[in-house]
Amino acid sequence: MPKNTQVMLMKDLSVELGSNKVLDEVNLAMMAGERLAIVGPSGSGKSTILRLIAGLLLPSEGRLQISGIEQNYLRLDQNSPPDVRLVFQNPALLASLTVRENVGFLLEKQKVFSDAIINKKVIKCLQKVGLYDVADKFPNQLSGGMQKRVSFARALISDSKKGKDSIPILLYDEPTAGLDPIACTRIEDLIIKTTEAAEGCSIVVSHVSSTIERTANRVIL
């Protein structure tokens, strides 16, 4: 996909939550291949931007386009929502499902591929984030770091309903908060590797200076 392809556009976008204006006439465009970092003090609306792109919130005013499509409905109300993938600070794995089932959850739900093909895709995604022989384990059998890697593997699963030209947007919300410097570096490397492997673009919200510097090629204040 050409680098000049616009993946996301916010135009004069504002968000009001009650009497509080969280975002005021934001203008932001993201192009294919970009890795953005959004920085600012607590309460400045960084996570609100992620919620908008994820389809969990609608703007009060202005426009939001993803892959050229106007976003007028919440994600759950769309028949074909945009390819947006979230990686939370908490891995958010389902404790009752194995690693294989957690990573392949979307594909199992869509029922497009056979179990054998889903398994192959899941194993490939796990290997890309450095995980081997864990597919049949449950989340509570893994270390915290391994659980986080599973959440990255899950973000590599492509929506079977999207075409080959679809450009996924990966959202990382405070991915290195509370980690020691060594763990921080590992996750930062994983953010870059995962975004490149998904052939997508990314937005990182973080207060950690090394994460901002290492994972972004453009910083939004």
Identify the residue ranges that each predicted region occupies:
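Catalytic Walker B motif of ABC-type/P-loop ATPase nucleotide-binding domains
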Residues: 165, 170-173
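ABC ATPase NBD coupling module
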Residues: 71-85, 109, 115
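Conserved ABC ATPase "signature" region
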Residues: 116-134
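Helical segment within the ABC ATPase nucleotide-binding domain
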Residues: 185-197
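H-loop/switch region of ABC-family ATPase nucleotide-binding domains
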Residues: 206-207
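Helix-to-loop junction immediately C-terminal to a conserved catalytic motif
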Residues: 54
